[in-house]
């Protein structure tokens, strides 16, 4: 048990899917897992373990932003011995290379947060995912007929009042979308010798102002959930 997770030691499988929204975690458990069991609920940040096609998998919410995500990822790795962490979330696209419903694999994560500079003694940390997980995601997407978009994301501490004038520069440096956690997830996994990857479904486009309806968001997210479960239980 930790200050933020009240699961017992052994309740988490080595493979864990992460979502910012704990209700999305509950949705995945109920719709996609067999024998799903709630294992933690501190602060209503839900976690579950269950089976997908007979193989064990865990789910955990992490809240919004790098600070919150880092807390849960640290405790999952250090206390519960989770070895592979896959964040599945939504993002706002900024690149013309991607559109609504596309799934992005974040091969690098820039950020306006100071957390990685603090942990890396004020140097620039290359926040990148695990290669084996990335390869597995890419190969699984190919098998499922999913056109996975690969590029960088920008993990911002700001949901509102973001520096929109910087979008053109980000696109120039092959940043496909804005989200809020990948840079912290990758850095924490690197520090603690775990494997991590972030997949994001495009729910809206910050340049064209297009956005999915609530129904379309669920449908597009389901495709990413299936991809995530398939690759994490191989």
Swiss-Prot record:
Coiled coil spans: none
Binding of a purine D-ribonucleoside, residues: 4, 179-181, 203-204
Catalytic activity: a purine D-ribonucleoside + phosphate = a purine nucleobase + alpha-D-ribose 1-phosphate; a purine 2'-deoxy-D-ribonucleoside + phosphate = a purine nucleobase + 2-deoxy-alpha-D-ribose 1-phosphate
Enzyme superclass (EC): transferase
PROSITE patterns recorded: PNP_UDP_1
Marked site: Important for catalytic activity: 217
EC number: 2.4.2.1
Active site per database record: 204 (proton donor)
GO CC entries: cytosol
GO BP annotation list: purine nucleoside catabolic process
GO molecular function, one term: purine-nucleoside phosphorylase activity
Key words, A-Z: Glycosyltransferase, Transferase
Gene3D superfamilies, per the entry: Nucleoside phosphorylase domain
Organism domain of life: Bacteria
Record text on subunit structure and interactions: Homohexamer; trimer of homodimers.
Task performed by this protein: Catalyzes the reversible phosphorolytic breakdown of the N-glycosidic bond in the beta-(deoxy)ribonucleoside molecules, with the formation of the corresponding free purine bases and pentose-1-phosphate.
Protein name, as recorded: Purine nucleoside phosphorylase DeoD-type
Underlying gene: deoD
């Amino acid at each position: 048990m930790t200050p933020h997770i009240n699961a017992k030691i052994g309740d988490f499988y080595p493979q864990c899917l992460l979502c910012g929204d704990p209700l999305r975690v509950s949705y995945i458990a109920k719709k996609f897992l067999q024998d799903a069991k709630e294992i933690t609920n501190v602060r209503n940040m839900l976690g579950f373990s269950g089976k997908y096609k007979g193989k064990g998998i865990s789910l955990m919410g992490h809240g919004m932003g790098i600070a919150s995500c880092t807390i849960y990822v640290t405790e999952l790795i250090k206390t519960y011995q989770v070895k592979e962490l896959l964040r599945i979330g939504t993002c706002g696209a900024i690149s013309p290379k991607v559109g609504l419903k596309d799934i992005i694999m974040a091969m690098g994560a820039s950020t306006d947060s100071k957390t990685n500079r603090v942990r890396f003694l004020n140097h620039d940390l290359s926040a990148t995912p695990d290669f084996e997980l990335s390869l597995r995601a890419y190969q699984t997407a190919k098998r499922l007929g999913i056109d996975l978009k690969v590029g960088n994301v920008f993990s911002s501490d700001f949901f509102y009042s973001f520096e929109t004038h910087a979008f053109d520069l980000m696109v120039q440096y092959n940043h496909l979308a804005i989200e809020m956690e990948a840079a912290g997830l990758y850095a924490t996994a690197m520090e603690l010798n775990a494997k991590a990857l972030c997949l994001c479904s495009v729910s809206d486009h910050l340049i064209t102002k297009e956005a999915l309806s609530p129904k379309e968001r669920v449908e597009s997210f389901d495709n990413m959930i299936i991809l995530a479960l398939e690759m994490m239980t191989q």
